[in-house]
């Protein structure tokens, strides 16, 4: 009998075991599409980013003009730039939904997969931050100044650390050059870690909406889920194209159409929408070091989630109290996002402080207590 190349070739075998003959639970829903959508986002961002990098100049006197030149004079440069800028937003939408799905259905109990996923989120946030600095507009410059300055809150070594990161005494040419280098490098680190993420996932297999073992009822990934993923790709790429073609500047800040000027501070310095929840938590604490610690904790808290799981059930599918708490948490994050975009004045300060307090209380205190209560109610 002739050898089946797909199943025996050293390289094709890896692809086959990951994308074709992979045993997959028969009941996973649309919420399991986001992993592959994130892969498509990454590929799109790397391709568009590479094309942009061929025309970009990482120098403070030329960066802004090189981006303008790209949009005006390069064939389809405007489209590539708009796809790249809005692709970042879609990337974050997908990753937040992906994390939310993992949280709801108890996927975090695959600890290695979850922890690498959190590291991927942190690197993605770093990549998006350094990328936002590259066009060298007003918000790029001041965003870089404000966020890098936060490291000065670290006791004893803070100021030295900031000046080392800047390559001088303020955000300037050396900063831009190194941020470009990092922005070019990090997506490939993300791609490498994604493979590790998948390797750990395929050790245990996917979770499913019921949160129970599904070894007795697995189906091949192709054609059942490959066709489902293609539908997801189409919907996402259509959304991206619509955003990039009809309202490319919807999610951007108009301040970034002004070249960076160290002598003029914009009235409201704020990051892109996908960082606003963390920015609101940072601002809600009046102390600099406290704010920085809260900012770090707002994302690093994800590492603790597997340790805070007190329920006897994996998924929230049959846990109505936890479901209510989960949707309160989602609403709370939306409130934080909105508050982060508002100026620092009366109603927003207290709303932000309450929402920040609620965020940590729900995750660290209420979820474990409610899970124990549900165990009692269900006599588990």
Swiss-Prot record:
GO cellular component annotations of the record: mitochondrial inner membrane; respiratory chain complex III
Compartment(s) of residence: Mitochondrion inner membrane
Membrane topology value: Multi-pass membrane protein
Principal cellular location given in the protein's record: mitochondrion
SUPFAM superfamilies: a domain/subunit of cytochrome bc1 complex (Ubiquinol-cytochrome c reductase) (SSF81648), Transmembrane di-heme cytochromes (SSF81342)
Matches recorded under Pfam families: Cytochrom_B_C, Cytochrome_B
Keyword presence, Methyltransferase: no
Protein name per UniProt: Cytochrome b
List of residues binding heme b b566: 98, 197
GO molecular function: metal ion binding; ubiquinol-cytochrome-c reductase activity
Annotated function: Component of the ubiquinol-cytochrome c reductase complex (complex III or cytochrome b-c1 complex) that is part of the mitochondrial respiratory chain. The b-c1 complex mediates electron transfer from ubiquinol to cytochrome c. Contributes to the generation of a proton gradient across the mitochondrial membrane that is then used for ATP synthesis.
PANTHER family: CYTOCHROME B
Source organism (scientific name): Seleucidis melanoleucus
Residues the record lists as binding heme b b562: 84, 183
Needed co-factor(s): heme b
Note: Heme 1 (or BL or b562) is low-potential and absorbs at about 562 nm, and heme 2 (or BH or b566) is high-potential and absorbs at about 566 nm.
Family: Belongs to the cytochrome b family.
Entry's transmembrane regions: 34-54, 78-99, 114-134, 179-199, 227-247, 289-309, 321-341, 348-368
Top-rank taxon: Eukaryota
Signal peptide extent: none
Residues that, per the record, bind a ubiquinone: 202
One Gene Ontology biological process: mitochondrial electron transport, ubiquinol to cytochrome c
Subunit details: The cytochrome bc1 complex contains 11 subunits: 3 respiratory subunits (MT-CYB, CYC1 and UQCRFS1), 2 core proteins (UQCRC1 and UQCRC2) and 6 low-molecular weight proteins (UQCRH/QCR6, UQCRB/QCR7, UQCRQ/QCR8, UQCR10/QCR9, UQCR11/QCR10 and a cleavage product of UQCRFS1). This cytochrome bc1 complex then forms a dimer.
Cofactor note: Binds 2 heme b groups non-covalently.
Keyword vocabulary terms for this entry: Electron transport, Heme, Iron, Membrane, Metal-binding, Mitochondrion, Mitochondrion inner membrane, Respiratory chain, Transmembrane, Transmembrane helix, Transport, Ubiquinone
């Amino acid at each position: 009998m002739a050898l089946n190349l797909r199943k025996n070739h050293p390289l094709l075998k890896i692809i086959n075991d990951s994308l074709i003959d992979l045993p997959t639970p028969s009941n996973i829903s649309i919420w399991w599409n986001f992993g592959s959508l994130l892969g498509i986002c990454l590929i799109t961002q790397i391709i568009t980013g590479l094309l942009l990098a061929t025309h970009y100049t990482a120098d403070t006197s030329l960066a802004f003009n090189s981006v303008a030149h790209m949009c005006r004079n390069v064939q389809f440069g405007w489209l590539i730039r708009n796809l790249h800028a809005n692709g970042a937003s879609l990337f974050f939408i997908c990753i937040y939904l992906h994390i939310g799905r993992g949280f709801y259905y108890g996927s975090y109990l695959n600890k290695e997969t979850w922890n690498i996923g959190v590291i991927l989120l942190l690197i993605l946030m770093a990549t998006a931050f350094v990328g936002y600095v590259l066009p060298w507009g007003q918000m790029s410059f001041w965003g870089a100044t404000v966020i890098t300055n936060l490291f000065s809150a670290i006791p004893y070594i803070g100021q030295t650390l900031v000046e080392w990161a800047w390559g001088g005494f303020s955000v300037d040419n050396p900063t831009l050059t190194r941020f470009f280098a990092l922005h070019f490098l990090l997506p490939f680190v993300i791609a490498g870690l994604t493979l590790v993420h998948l390797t750990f996932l395929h050790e245990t297999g996917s979770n499913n909406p019921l949160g129970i073992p599904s070894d007795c009822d697995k189906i091949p990934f192709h054609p059942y889920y490959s066709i489902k993923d293609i539908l997801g790709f189409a919907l996402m790429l259509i959304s991206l194209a619509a955003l990039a073609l009809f309202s490319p500047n919807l999610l951007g800040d108009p301040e970034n159409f002004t070249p960076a000027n160290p002598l003029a501070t914009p009235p409201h310095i704020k990051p892109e929408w996908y960082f606003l929840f963390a920015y609101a938590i940072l601002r809600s604490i009046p102390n600099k070091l406290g704010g920085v610690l809260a900012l770090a904790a707002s994302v690093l808290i994800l590492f603790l989630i597997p340790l805070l799981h007190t329920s006897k059930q994996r998924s929230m599918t049959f846990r109505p109290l936890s479901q209510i708490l989960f949707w309160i948490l989602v609403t709370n994050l939306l409130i934080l996002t909105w508050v982060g975009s508002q100026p620092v004045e009366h109603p927003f300060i207290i709303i932000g402080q309450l929402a920040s307090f609620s965020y940590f209380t729900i995750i660290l205190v209420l979820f474990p207590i409610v899970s124990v209560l549900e165990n009692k109610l269900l006599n588990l």
